[in-house]
Amino acid sequence: MSQEKKVFKTEWAGRPLIIETGQLAKQANGAVLVRYGDTVVLSTATASKEPRDVDFFPLMVNYEEKLYAAGKIPGGFNKREGRPGEDATLTSRLIDRPIRPLFPKGYRHDVQVISIVMSVDPDNSPEMAAMIGSSMALAVSDIPFEGPIAGVNVGLVDGELIINPDVQQREVSVLDLQVAGHFDAVNMVEAGAKEVAEDKMLEAIMFGHAEIKKLVEFQQSIIDEIQPVKSEFVPVEVDADLESKVEQLSESFGLSQAIQTQEKLAREENITAIKLKVIEAFEGEDEAVITAVNKKFDALIKEEVRRLITEEKVRPDGRRPDEIRPLDSEVGILPRVHGSGLFTRGQTQALSVATLGALGEHQIIDGLGVEEEKRYMHHYNFPNFSVGETGPIRAPGRREIGHGALGERALLQVIPDEKEFPYTIRVVSEVLESNGSSSQASICGSTLALMDAGVPIKAPVAGIAMGLVTKDENYTILSDIQGMEDALGDMDFKVAGTKEGITAIQMDIKINGLTEDILREALEQARVGRLHIMEHMLSTISEPRAELSQYAPKIEIIHINPDKIRDVIGPGGKKINEIIDATGVKLDIEQDGTVFIGSSDASMIEAAKKLIENIVREAEVGQIYMATVKRIEKFGAFVEIFPGKDALVHISQIALERINKVEDVVKLGDQFLVKVTEIDKQGRVNASRKVLLEEEKKASEEK
C-alpha cells in the first residue's frame, strides 16, 4: 500500500465525496478515509500471512459505530461502546454480501474488513460510505480482489427516484432500497417498501446501478493511479487421477439417484452412504488424500445438482423450477398467547407468536442518529433441532438478526398506525424445521399470528425465496428454494409483499452479478409464487379477528388538554405513579394530550380513567357543585368541589347574613352546595353558598 497521502474528489448525489489514502492505518494491508459531506468513515482491510486449512472463505466484515461520531457519550457504568447494535450488525452483513463473491475461488487467507464511523452527518449515509471504503481498502491493498464495488441508497418520493435521499426525503419515501454491484452488474439488493410494484422496483434497482457505475469508475481511477501490487494466489493443484476415480466411483454407486431422493433426511442419508463407500475405496491413504476425496465428492454433488436443474429442469426433490412445495398452516394453536400462526412449506416450518403490549413497552433505538422508538418488533430464532443437529445455545447471531430484520421490514409496512391500534407489537418466529426459505416461512407465519391476534393489518404479507443456477449463458430460476439449492446454487433472492406489491426484498448471490433480464424474470416469478402462497394463507384465516384475545391488554384512549399533562404527571411523576399503583394500569401520554390506558382488567381501566378525568376536570362558571370544607381561614373557607379541584368561598359568600367568623357557620368536613361565580386568570376558582341560599329564599317566598 502506498505510504504517500493522496486525496481524490468527486461528487455523489450532489454532495462532495472525498477518498484519502496513505495517511492513516498504514500497517493494514489497505486503508482509506472516506468523507461524504460531514460523514467520515475509516475502512481497513487486513489479511493473514498464511491460508487456513478450512473448506470456506474466512472473511469477517465489521462495521463499528462510535458514539463520538454523533457527539454522544455512551450510557451505562463503563461509558464505553459495547457489542455492536442491531443496526451495526445489519450493516456489516450489507457490506459483506457484495464483496464476498469477488475473491478468488479457493482463497483461504483470513480477511478482515473493518469500517469505523468517525463522524456522522444524518443526511449522508455512513453505511454507503463504509461500503465504498471497504471496496477501496481491498482494492488498494495487496489482497486479491476482483472489485471495486459500490452501493447506493435509492428512495421514491412522489413518484421520483432519488439517489441517497436526505433525512426529510427518507421520512416520506415509499421505498428504502440499498443496491450494490460492480460496473457490469448488480450483486446485492436490500429493500423495504410500501407495496411497490415489481416493475417500479426493477426500475429503482437499475437506477441505482447507473449511479454505481459512476462510483466504480471513480474508484478505478484511484486504483489506476496508485497501482497496487497484488499478492499472487495460486489455487491448490488437483490430482486428476484421484478426481477421476472419485467421479467414476460416485457414478457407479448411484450418486445422481441419491441426490434425487425427495425427502431431505433420506437424501442426506443416501448421499452419506455413497460417500462412505467412496472413501472406503481409498482405505489406507493418508489424511491429505481423504481430504481431497471429500472435497471432490462435495464438488460432484454440486455439479450434479446444477446439471439436473439446468439441463433436465429437474430439482433434487422432483419439482419443476417454478413449483412450490406443499403448504399447510394453522392459527390459534397456543391457548394463552395473544396470537399464533404455524406455517409449513415442505420440510420448513415456522411457529410465529404475536404479543401485544402498551405503547410504553416500545424499544428505544439510541444509535448515531436521532433517538427512535420502535413499536413493532420481529425476532427470529433458529434452534439446532430445526435441522436435526446438536450444539450450544447462544445469543442470536448475525444470521438470526438479519432474518428477523427482514421479516420486520416486510410486515412493518402493513402495521396500523398507533392512533388506530395503540399497541406495541412483538412477533417471535421459532423455526421448528428447516429445509430452506425459513426466513420467508417466518414472514408467512407472522402474518397469520398478527391476524389471529386481531391486529388490523392493512393487508396480509407472504414471502418466497427464489434461486438461480447458471451454466455458461443459460440459467434457470427456481421458486421456493430448499436448503440444497440454496447451498449449491448461485442466488438467494427473498421477496415479500402483499397482493399489491413488494414490502421487502433481499438478494445474495455467489456469482459476479445479475443482469436486468434475470432480475425482471426473478421478480415476476416471485410475484406469481407469492400470490399462490397468499391464497393458501387466506384459506386459513381470511381477515384479522374482530376481537383481541381475552388475555391481551385492553387499551382505552382519552384526550385531555395538553396544558393539563403536568397535572396528571405531578411533581416528579408523583401523581401518575399514584394512579398506576392504585389501578395497576400502564399509562402513556402523548404531547398532544392523548392518553393511552392499558390493562387486562377493564374495571381498572375505568378506575384510572376516572382518576385522570377528575385531575383534568375543569370547573365552570355558573355550575353547582357539592363542596366539602377542606380548610378554614379568617377570610373564608377553602372547599373541594370535585377531586383535585378547590375553590374559595369568601366569608361574605357563606351565609345570607353578615358573619364575624367562618367557624360560626361551617366546620371542617361540612358539605353543602356552592355555585362557581368566577375563575380568575390564574385559574383560581371563587364560589358562593350565599347565591344559592338567596335563590332558595326567593323561590320559597314566591310560593
UniProtKB/Swiss-Prot annotation:
It comes from the Bacteria. Residues 553-612 form the KH domain. Pfam families: KH_1 (PF00013), PNPase (PF03726), RNase_PH (PF01138), RNase_PH_C (PF03725), S1 (PF00575). It is an enzyme of class 2 (transferase). Its EC number is 2.7.7.8. The keyword Calcium does not apply. InterPro entries: ExoRNase_PH_dom1, ExoRNase_PH_dom2, ExoRNase_PH_dom2_sf, KH_dom, KH_dom_type_1, KH_dom_type_1_sf, NA-bd_OB-fold, PNPase. It catalyses: RNA(n+1) + phosphate = RNA(n) + a ribonucleoside 5'-diphosphate. One of its GO terms (biological process) is RNA processing. GO terms for molecular function: 3'-5'-RNA exonuclease activity; magnesium ion binding; polyribonucleotide nucleotidyltransferase activity; RNA binding. It is found in: Cytoplasm. GO terms for cellular component: cytosol. Its main location: cytoplasm. Mg(2+) binds at residues 486, 492. The keyword Magnesium applies. Residues 622-690 form the S1 motif domain. Its cofactor is Mg(2+). Belongs to the polyribonucleotide nucleotidyltransferase family. Involved in mRNA degradation. Catalyzes the phosphorolysis of single-stranded polyribonucleotides processively in the 3'- to 5'-direction. This is Polyribonucleotide nucleotidyltransferase. It comes from Macrococcus caseolyticus (strain JCSC5402) (Macrococcoides caseolyticum).
